[in-house]
């Protein structure tokens, strides 16, 4: 009896001690703020609508982007050298189930190339493709990039001194990647470079426009972006019209909105197929800088100054790009864990809501790091396939999906003059349109849905008007 009583007392003491831990980890929906963010005017075009369909994204960080490690015996060990765990379909399924519709897969290619032509290892390429397929099979969108490849010797480096080797690297690597994925549809997006910058320079992380080295670097980035676009387009197949992402200096908001940055030209017929790539951990002392390095864990959702730390760069992006119908994706954002869950929930909810109001997509940076004093950007525990901070994710999902937007426009296929009817006037207009020497792609004229407007569409429209085809496509 005494042993039984002692056991029960011991059990109760342990159970009572665990209660605070259980309560501390209990889900708290009340942390998610109720926001009313005024919606900006968003142009209606294919590029903007495409990005809208991506909804919300998640980064498979510290995985294929790893370029060193202590336990690497074969090249596939790079995948686990930083995160410690191999990517599985179960992980991607959990990401999809939580509400993410896009996965960005950062890849560092330079440890896996050989020879003067930068031949990519088939073993590495096959494994990357396998994980891409995990996402594609879930009907998710995928962004594939070149990540930690900014290197004077092994990769590319955006300065005039290294432009010859940089151009060769970018064109060689992207020709191979594009060829491998040429038959993938628009669910796969290519991102030419990740945070291109002058590594080791005093202005590595800030585009100081009074510095001639920085201006030279921006001009080189412009050229490398153009080389990337030209290379991918030249491989043909679905790459001829694939959506592509291009960054400015260090992929910062200022890098993309300064007067020296130029978006690359695209081939005729591609309208708004080039997406501006931006990374923004703003304000950095809260979102990215660890407490041990002088960061802060404070950010007040009701303070106008703190709000402006988010809205200033989004307004700049909106004014230069999305308000003009040029799509933008924030490929990396987030807030490191500083034992400040409530603040991070409010910050990420506010961040996504403000971006959504401006037609900008957000992709959460997740490096699977949950301990220590550094960049604790871990959100999804890849071993348990559970989100450690579900309130943060649910806040992001809430405002990525529920922000007030105009309804998708009704597309009347074959309606050349946009009067709501399809008749002989539209046939005459489409015929004249096709005979023009150079014409842009117009979605509602593509009546056979092959991503081209040509004589085949005219023939189908004729059959429809003659009663030989019962109906045209609809959205």
From Swiss-Prot:
Leader peptide range in chain numbering: 1-26
Membrane keyword on record: no
The reaction(s) this protein catalyses: Endohydrolysis of (1->4)-beta-D-glucosidic linkages in cellulose, lichenin and cereal beta-D-glucans
Listed transmembrane segments: none
One Pfam family from the record: Cellulase
Occurrences of domain Dockerin (ranges): 409-474
CDD domains noted in UniProt: Dockerin (cd14253)
Active site: residue positions: 147, 195 (proton donor), 332 (nucleophile)
InterPro entries to which the protein is assigned, alphabetical: Dockerin_1_rpt (IPR002105), Dockerin_dom (IPR016134), Dockerin_dom_sf (IPR036439), EF_Hand_1_Ca_BS (IPR018247), Glyco_hydro_5 (IPR001547), Glyco_hydro_5_CS (IPR018087), Glycoside_hydrolase_SF (IPR017853), Glycosyl_hydrolase_5 (IPR050386)
GO molecular function: beta-glucosidase activity; cellulase activity
Phenotype upon changing residue 147 to S/E/G/F: Total loss of activity
Note: The C-terminus (AA 411-475) may play a role in organizing the cellulosome complex.
Family membership noted in the UniProt record: Belongs to the glycosyl hydrolase 5 (cellulase A) family.
Protein name: Endoglucanase A
Organism: Ruminiclostridium cellulolyticum (strain ATCC 35319 / DSM 5812 / JCM 6584 / H10) (Clostridium cellulolyticum)
């Amino acid at each position: 009896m005494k042993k039984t009583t002692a056991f029960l007392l011991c059990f109760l003491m342990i159970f009572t001690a665990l209660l605070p831990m259980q309560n501390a980890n209990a889900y708290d929906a009340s942390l998610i703020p109720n926001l009313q963010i005024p919606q900006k005017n968003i142009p209606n075009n294919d590029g903007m609508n495409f990005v809208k369909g991506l909804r919300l994204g998640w980064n498979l960080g510290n995985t294929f982007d790893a370029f060193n490690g202590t336990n690497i015996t074969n090249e596939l060990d790079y995948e686990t050298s930083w995160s410690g765990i191999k990517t599985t379909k179960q992980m991607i399924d959990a990401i999809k189930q939580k509400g993410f519709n896009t996965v960005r897969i950062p890849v560092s290619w330079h440890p896996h190339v050989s020879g003067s032509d930068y031949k990519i290892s088939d073993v590495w390429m096959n494994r990357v493709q396998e994980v891409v397929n995990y996402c594609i099979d879930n009907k998710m969108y995928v962004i594939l990039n070149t990540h930690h490849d900014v290197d004077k010797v092994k990769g590319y480096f955006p300065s005039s001194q290294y432009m010859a080797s940089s151009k060769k690297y970018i064109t060689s690597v992207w020709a191979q990647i594009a060829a491998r994925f040429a038959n993938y549809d628009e669910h796969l997006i290519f991102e030419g470079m990740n945070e291109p910058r002058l590594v080791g320079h005093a202005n590595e992380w800030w585009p100081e426009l009074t510095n001639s080295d920085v201006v030279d670097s921006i001009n080189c980035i412009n050229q490398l972006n153009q080389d990337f676009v030209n290379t991918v387009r030249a491989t043909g197949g679905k790459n001829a019209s694939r959506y592509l992402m291009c960054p400015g200096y260090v992929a910062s908001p200022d890098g993309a909105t300064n007067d020296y940055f130029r978006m690359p030209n695209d081939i005729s017929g591609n309208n708004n197929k080039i997406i501006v790539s931006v990374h923004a951990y703003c304000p950095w002392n809260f979102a990215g800088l660890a407490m041990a390095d002088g960061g802060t864990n404070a950010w007040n959702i009701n303070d106008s100054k703190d709000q402006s730390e988010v809205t200033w760069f989004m307004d700049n992006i909106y004014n230069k790009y999305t308000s003009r119908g040029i799509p933008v994706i924030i490929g990396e954002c987030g807030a490191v864990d500083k034992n400040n869950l409530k603040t991070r929930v409010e910050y990420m909810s506010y961040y996504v809501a403000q971006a959504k109001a401006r037609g900008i997509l957000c992709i959460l940076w997740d490096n699977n790091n949950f301990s220590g004093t550094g960049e604790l950007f871990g959100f999804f525990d890849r071993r348990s396939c559970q989100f450690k901070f579900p309130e943060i994710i649910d806040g992001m999902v809430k405002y990525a999906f529920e922000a007030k937007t105009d309804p998708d426009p009704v597309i009347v296929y074959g309606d050349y003059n946009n009067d709501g009817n399809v008749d002989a006037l539209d046939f005459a207009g489409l015929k004249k349109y096709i005979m023009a020497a150079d014409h842009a792609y117009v979605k509602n004229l593509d009546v056979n849905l092959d991503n081209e407007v040509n004589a085949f569409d005219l023939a189908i429209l004729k059959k429809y008007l003659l009663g030989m085809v019962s109906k045209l496509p609809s959205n």
